[in-house]
């Protein structure tokens, strides 16, 4: 068995075309979604990621802006800028690129975003809504993972899904989405005993810990579906996933590559949530 490659680039391309069509429809009502991104400091990876989001938004017809603040910017100034965006009726969605400099509290900043413009889905209100099955804005990587599984027609009902990692950004929210799809979900983490035994029982594995080579063919059962969220740069700057891709693809039924798997869907879901935010505030959701 050689695994079906779950091509995130192609899935994202098709999804973004549908978003572009919806943006065009919205423009007929006189509304254009706008994504505002706050970037504090000069972290190279963050700058690159923010530019990718801006470019992707503009490519589907949205307006996008980057508010680039100096590394030494105080927390008060960041919060003031957020308040301005919260009250700007032209802004549909707001996200703050992390990590933030040490003088700025990430939690304070995330809590200061208007939950109705929180397109990253990290505000406590939006996290809470996810956990009572009444979500509006869901964190983008978990949402992207579910789109990959849906696109591949993978039926999750009754399946054993194992999530490696318990972060609030990926592990915990994707576990909740898998539960909503009626999978039986196990979360593995750094204190889990006998991780291999859990992995061997898994029909679906989602790994999101940033440990290259963690998942090997020895701990994957034949026919499992593998979603690799890891993206750790090696000494040459090449991105490595958590999964030993070349060997695991020989026994899995489907697998995401790194890069080109989950990553393109994460940015796509930022756009999805920005469009949703604009529709909701204009009363245009069906």
From Swiss-Prot:
One of its GO terms (cellular component) is cytosol. One of its GO terms (biological process) is tetrahydrofolate interconversion. Keywords: Amino-acid biosynthesis, Histidine biosynthesis, Hydrolase, Methionine biosynthesis, Multifunctional enzyme, NADP, One-carbon metabolism, Oxidoreductase, Purine biosynthesis. GO terms for molecular function: methenyltetrahydrofolate cyclohydrolase activity; methylenetetrahydrofolate dehydrogenase (NADP+) activity. It catalyses: (6R)-5,10-methylene-5,6,7,8-tetrahydrofolate + NADP(+) = (6R)-5,10-methenyltetrahydrofolate + NADPH; (6R)-5,10-methenyltetrahydrofolate + H2O = (6R)-10-formyltetrahydrofolate + H(+). Its EC number is 1.5.1.5, 3.5.4.9. NADP(+) binds at residues 165-167, 190. The keyword Disulfide bond does not apply. Pathway: One-carbon metabolism; tetrahydrofolate interconversion. SUPFAM superfamilies: Aminoacid dehydrogenase-like, N-terminal domain, NAD(P)-binding Rossmann-fold domains. The keyword Nucleotide-binding does not apply. InterPro entries: Aminoacid_DH-like_N_sf (IPR046346), NAD(P)-bd_dom_sf (IPR036291), THF_DH/CycHdrlase (IPR000672), THF_DH/CycHdrlase_cat_dom (IPR020630), THF_DH/CycHdrlase_NAD-bd_dom (IPR020631). NCBIfam families: PRK14175.1, PRK14186.1. Catalyzes the oxidation of 5,10-methylenetetrahydrofolate to 5,10-methenyltetrahydrofolate and then the hydrolysis of 5,10-methenyltetrahydrofolate to 10-formyltetrahydrofolate. Belongs to the tetrahydrofolate dehydrogenase/cyclohydrolase family. Homodimer. PANTHER family: C-1-TETRAHYDROFOLATE SYNTHASE, CYTOPLASMIC, C-1-TETRAHYDROFOLATE SYNTHASE, CYTOPLASMIC-RELATED. This is Bifunctional protein FolD. The gene is folD.
């Amino acid at each position: 068995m050689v695994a079906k490659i779950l091509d995130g680039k192609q899935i994202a391309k098709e999804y973004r075309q549908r978003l572009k069509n919806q943006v065009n429809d919205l423009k007929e009502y006189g509304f254009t979604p706008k994504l505002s991104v706050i970037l504090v400091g000069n972290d190279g990876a963050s700058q690159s990621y923010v530019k990718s989001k801006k470019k992707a938004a503009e490519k589907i017809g949205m307006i996008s802006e980057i508010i680039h603040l100096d590394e030494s910017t105080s927390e008060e100034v960041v919060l003031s800028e957020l308040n301005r965006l919260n009250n700007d009726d032209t802004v549909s969605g707001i996200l703050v690129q992390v990590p933030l400099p040490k003088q700025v509290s990430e939690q304070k900043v995330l809590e200061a975003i208007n939950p109705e413009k929180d397109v990253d889905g990290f505000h406590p209100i939006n996290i809470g809504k996810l956990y009572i099955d009444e979500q509006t804005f869901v964190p983008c990587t978990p949402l992207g993972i579910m789109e990959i599984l849906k696109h591949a027609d993978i039926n999750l009902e009754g399946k054993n899904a194992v999530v490696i990692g318990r972060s609030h950004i990926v592990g915990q929210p994707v576990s909740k989405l898998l539960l909503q799809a009626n999978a039986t979900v196990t979360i593995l983490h750094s204190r889990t005993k006998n991780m291999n035994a859990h992995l061997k029982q898994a029909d679906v594995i989602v790994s999101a810990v940033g440990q290259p080579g963690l998942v090997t063919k020895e701990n994957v059962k034949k026919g499992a579906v593998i979603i690799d969220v890891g993206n750790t740069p090696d000494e040459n700057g090449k991105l490595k996933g958590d999964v030993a891709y070349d060997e695991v693809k020989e026994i899995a039924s489907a697998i995401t590559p790194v890069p080109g798997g989950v990553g393109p869907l994460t940015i796509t879901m930022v756009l999805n949530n920005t469009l949703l935010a604009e529709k909701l505030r204009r009363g245009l959701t069906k």
